[in-house]
Each structure stands twice: as structure tokens, then as C-alpha cells.
From Swiss-Prot:
Residue(s) carrying S-(dipyrrolylmethanemethyl)cysteine: 242
Protein's name according to its UniProt entry: Porphobilinogen deaminase
Species, as recorded: Proteus mirabilis
Similarity remark: Belongs to the HMBS family.
Keyword vocabulary terms for this entry: Porphyrin biosynthesis, Transferase
Length: 313
């Protein structure tokens, strides 16, 4: 008998709830008689807000509790922002669906300046991401980068209170929360290469739950999945988490996949870059070879220093 109800494990932040409701809506469009319930929960990454993410340690800060709900059958699927999904999954769980990607770029948000270029020397810019930090420091070593934690609303409040001259957020998150007017400019991939999977929503479930996987098939966006899998293959070879200075971005260029990647020292003084243009069937292998190229250039030393806690600005 076909499954009649699906329970979605989700974080409680407004953006996470948007993602879960989006998946609920898409499931009910594809399967009108399906009952979809949300199971909101709090993750470690939501609780520890007074410490930079890179120093909290561990992988899966925003997903572990959701995965426990899957393993204990309190939920059938977990909905994630792909940039938060670790490279490894607990035994019995896996990523089965990747939805169509929203704009993956980073957004420059400020109340007084229209672009990164307009910021005066000494301006304070907020971000919790070492990936954004290293690229900002490389572009503008005269800026002061300060840690910025909390959900999107909290971060915007800190900007509005005058704690920062500008902050960097994901374009996708602002668009999904109907806050597009806060975007003063979008950073190009040359200015700020996006995070692995940025802008895409992924769905995790139990690998033996074939009924649920069959229901999810309608939500998978093949072109997005090809790109994100290439980005994740690179990240896997680098053994990267979601809180390290790694960028990876794949797009379709005619019938090829153009994959770009970087690893940067947090101080921005060293940025290693590489790219590949390959057939879609070779995209994941291209991610692996691109990672090996970056490792040969010195990425291992940069990442080892980060894992040892050397994230000083």
C-alpha cells in the first residue's frame, strides 16, 4: 500500500521552515492525496551562537539532530540547505533528492554603501564563513572582518543596530524570505565563489525506505544534482566540512559542466584556484581531480591549519 503520510524533520529557523514548507508544497503538488507533516527541532548550530562556527568544531552542526530523528523513525525525511550537509552520512541514511537551485551567489548587504568596492578602508564587514572571509580579505585587505552569527533576521538586526558597515549573506536565503530589497549588490563568482551546494535544497532519508524515495523522485532536479554532486565530490576529496575556506561552483555551459574551486587561507594572503570544463558524465571525477590539483598546490597545509584552530583574521 502506498505511503499516505510523510513527516519532515526541519530546523526551526525561518529559512529552514521555508525550505521544509517548499518541499511540503512540491510533494503535495506531485501527490495531491499525500499528508505532509513538519517535525521542527533545534540543532547544535542553532544553540551555540557565541562562538565562530569554525571553532565550534565537528561536522554536521545543523543536521545531526535531524538525522537522529530519521534513524529513530520520528521523521521520514530531513530537509537541508545543501551547503550545510556534511560529506559523510550515518549508516543507513543518504541524500536522495536535490531540488532546483536558487541563485547561489553571495549578497552584499549594507545600509550606507551599494557595493563592496564603495566601502571605505577600515569598514567592518560581518560574516561567519571562512570561505567568505578569505575572499573578502584577498579583495579588500583594508577591511575589518568580524564574526556574525544567528539566523538571517538576527544578522540583519545587528547590521541595522550599527554593529557592522556591511554584512555578507546568501542571495538565495534573502530571496526565499522575501528580503530581496536588502540586497545592495550580488557578488560575482569571481569576487566570492559560492559554497558547495549553495542555493540548493537537499532531502535526506533512510536508504531502505523505498516508498518515500519513490515519492521524492518528482522533486529531484537532474541538472542541479549533476552540478552539486561535482561540487561535493571535490569537497569529499578535500575532506572539507561546511565551516572551512572552500568554495566550489559548477554550472552548465551549453552541454558541458564548468566547475570552479578554491581553497583560501583565512587571512586571504593565499587563495588557490582551479577549474575544469567536462562532460556531465565526468563531472564527479572532475571534482576529484580538481581537489587533487588544489592539494598539490598546498591546500592540505591550509586546511590542516584551519582544523587546528588557526583561523585568525
Amino acid at each position: 500500500m502506498p505511503k499516505s503520510t510523510i513527516r519532515i524533520a526541519t530546523r526551526q529557523s525561518p529559512l529552514a521552515m521555508w525550505q521544509a514548507l517548499y518541499v511540503k508544497e512540491q510533494l503535495q503538488i506531485a501527490h495531491p492525496s499525500l499528508v505532509v507533516e513538519l517535525v521542527p527541532m533545534v540543532t547544535k548550530g542553532d544553540i551555540i551562537l557565541d562562538t565562530p562556527l569554525a571553532k565550534v568544531g565537528g561536522k554536521g552542526l545543523f543536521v545531526k539532530e535531524l538525522e537522529l530523528a530519521l534513524l529513530s523513525s520520528r521523521a521520514d525525511i530531513a530537509v537541508h540547505s545543501m551547503k550545510d550537509v556534511p560529506i559523510d552520512f550515518p549508516e543507513g541514511l543518504g541524500l536522495v533528492t536535490i531540488c532546483e537551485r536558487e541563485d547561489p551567489r553571495d549578497a552584499f548587504v549594507s545600509n550606507h554603501y551599494d557595493s563592496l568596492e564603495q566601502l571605505p578602508a577600515g569598514s567592518v564587514v560581518g560574516t561567519s564563513s571562512l570561505r567568505r572571509q578569505c575572499q573578502l580579505k584577498a579583495l579588500r585587505p583594508d577591511l575589518i572582518i568580524r564574526d556574525l552569527r544567528g539566523n538571517v533576521g538576527t544578522r540583519l538586526s545587528k547590521l541595522d543596530n550599527g554593529d557592522y558597515d556591511a554584512i555578507i549573506l546568501a542571495v538565495a536565503g534573502l530571496k526565499r524570505l522575501k528580503l530581496t530589497e536588502r540586497i545592495r549588490s550580488s557578488l560575482s563568482a569571481e569576487q566570492s565563489l559560492p559554497a558547495v551546494g549553495q542555493g540548493a535544497v537537499g532531502i535526506e532519508c533512510r536508504l531502505d525506505d523505498h516508498d518515500t524515495q519513490a515519492l521524492l523522485a518528482a522533486l529531484n532536479h537532474a541538472d542541479t544534482a549533476t552540478c552539486v554532486k561535482a561540487e561535493r565530490a571535490m569537497n569529499t576529496r578535500l575532506e572539507g566540512g561546511c565551516q572551512v575556506p572552500i568554495g566550489s561552483y559548477a554550472i552548465w555551459q551549453n552541454d558541458k559542466i564548468w566547475l570552479r574551486a578554491l581553497v583560501g587561507a583565512p587571512d586571504g594572503k593565499t587563495i588557490l584556484r582551479g577549474e575544469r570544463l567536462v562532460s556531465p558524465e565526468d563531472a564527479e571525477q572532475a571534482g576529484i581531480s580538481l581537489a587533487e590539483e588544489l592539494l598539490d598546490k598546498g591546500a592540505r597545509e591550509i586546511l590542516t591549519a584551519v582544523y587546528q584552530g588557526n583561523t585568525a583574521i
